[in-house]
C-alpha cells in the first residue's frame, strides 16, 4: 500500500466520522503510522543480529531468540495497524452500497422521484449500526493486541538479560543480551500509550453515538406527529412520481412497478 492509497483511505473514513473519529484518525496517522515508519524499523532493525548469547553452540542463539521473540514487535504492530483500520472500511462499503442503490432507484424511476436517502453518508438506519459495529471491532482488536503484547513478552518492559534453560540444542542455561533495551522499552511504552489513547477515543465515540441516538429518539417521541408523518409524506411523493411515469407511458398499468405505492411506507433505508 503506497501513501496515495493510504491517504485516500483515511480521507474516505474521515468524511463520515464524528469529531472523536477524526481525532482517532489523527492519532493513528501521526503517533502510530508515522512513528512506526520513521522510528520503528531503526529501533528494531538490529534485534536478531545483535542478540548476543554466551555460547558457541551452533543454533543456540537462534533458538533462544525465537524463545523470547516468538513474533517480532515491529511485525505485531504492523498487523495491529492493519487490523485496527480495516473496520473503517465497513462504513465506506456501506455508504458505497447506499450510493449505488440510490443511483439505480433514480435510473429506474427518474430524477423527479423521491430519494431513498436524504444523505447517503448520514449515520441513520443501518449505517448507524455499521458505524457502531466498526467501533466495537476496533476496541476488540486494540485489546487483543495489547493482551498479546503483554503475554508474549511477559509485560511491556524489555529486560537487558534473558536466560534460555532446557532449550535444545543449548547444553545448559544460556545468558543472552538484548541490544538497546532501554530504547526499545521506551518505544514499546509509547506504542502502548498510543493504543490506550485510541481505546479511550473509540470508547468516547461509542458513548457519543449512543447518547445522540437516544436524544434523537426522545425528540421524535415528543413531536406531535410522532413517526407517522414521514412515511405518509414519502408515500404520497412516491405515488405522485409513479403516476407521472404512467402518464408519460414509461410504465404499464399492470407492470410490477405498480406495487411501488403500496410498498412505499415499508421502504426502510439500509
Swiss-Prot record:
It is found in: Cell membrane; Cell junction, Gap junction. Residues 41-75, 150-187 are extracellular. It is a multi-pass membrane protein. Disulfide bonds: none annotated. One of its GO terms (cellular component) is intracellular membrane-bounded organelle. Gene3D superfamilies: Gap junction channel protein cysteine-rich domain (1.20.1440.80). Keywords: Cell junction, Cell membrane, Gap junction, Membrane, Transmembrane, Transmembrane helix. InterPro entries: Connexin, Connexin31, Connexin_CCC, Connexin_CS, Connexin_N, Connexin_N_sf. Its main location: membrane. The chain crosses the membrane at residues 21-40, 76-98, 127-149, 188-210. Pfam families: Connexin (PF00029). Residues 1-20, 99-126, 211-270 are cytoplasmic. Belongs to the connexin family. Beta-type (group I) subfamily. One gap junction consists of a cluster of closely packed pairs of transmembrane channels, the connexons, through which materials of low MW diffuse from one cell to a neighboring cell. A connexon is composed of a hexamer of connexins. Interacts with CNST. This is Gap junction beta-3 protein. The gene is GJB3.
Amino acid at each position: 500500500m503506497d501513501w496515495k492509497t493510504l491517504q485516500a483511505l483515511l480521507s474516505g473514513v474521515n468524511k463520515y466520522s464524528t469529531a472523536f473519529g477524526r481525532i482517532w484518525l489523527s492519532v493513528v496517522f501521526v503517533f502510530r503510522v508515522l512513528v512506526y515508519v520513521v522510528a520503528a524499523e531503526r529501533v528494531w532493525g538490529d534485534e536478531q543480529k545483535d542478540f548476543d548469547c554466551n555460547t558457541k553452540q551452533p543454533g543456540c542463539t537462534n533458538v533462544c531468540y525465537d524463545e523470547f521473540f516468538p513474533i517480532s514487535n515491529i511485525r505485531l504492530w504492523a498487523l495491529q495497524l492493519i487490523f485496527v483500520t480495516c473496520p473503517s472500511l465497513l462504513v465506506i462499503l456501506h455508504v458505497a452500497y447506499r450510493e449505488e442503490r440510490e443511483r439505480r432507484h433514480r435510473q429506474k424511476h427518474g430524477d423527479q422521484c423521491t430519494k431513498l436517502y436524504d444523505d447517503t453518508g448520514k449515520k441513520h438506519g443501518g449505517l448507524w449500526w455499521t458505524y457502531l459495529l466498526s467501533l466495537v471491532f476496533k476496541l476488540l482488536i486494540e485489546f487483543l493486541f495489547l493482551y498479546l503484547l503483554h503475554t508474549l513478552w511477559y509485560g511491556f518492559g524489555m529486560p537487558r538479560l534473558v536466560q534460555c534453560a532446557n532449550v535444545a540444542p543449548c547444553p545448559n542455561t544460556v545468558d543472552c543480551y538484548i541490544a538497546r533495551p532501554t530504547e526499545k522499552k521506551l518505544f514499546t511504552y509509547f506504542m502502548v500509550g498510543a493504543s490506550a489513547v485510541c481505546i479511550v477515543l473509540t470508547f468516547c465515540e461509542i458513548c457519543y453515538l449512543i447518547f445522540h441516538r437516544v436524544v434523537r429518539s426522545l425528540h421524535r417521541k415528543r413531536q406531535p406527529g410522532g413517526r407517522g408523518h414521514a412515511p405518509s409524506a414519502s408515500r404520497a411523493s412516491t405515488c405522485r412520481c409513479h403516476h407521472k411515469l404512467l402518464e408519460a407511458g414509461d410504465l404499464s398499468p399492470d407492470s410490477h412497478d405498480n406495487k411501488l405505492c403500496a410498498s412505499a411506507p415499508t421502504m426502510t433505508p439500509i
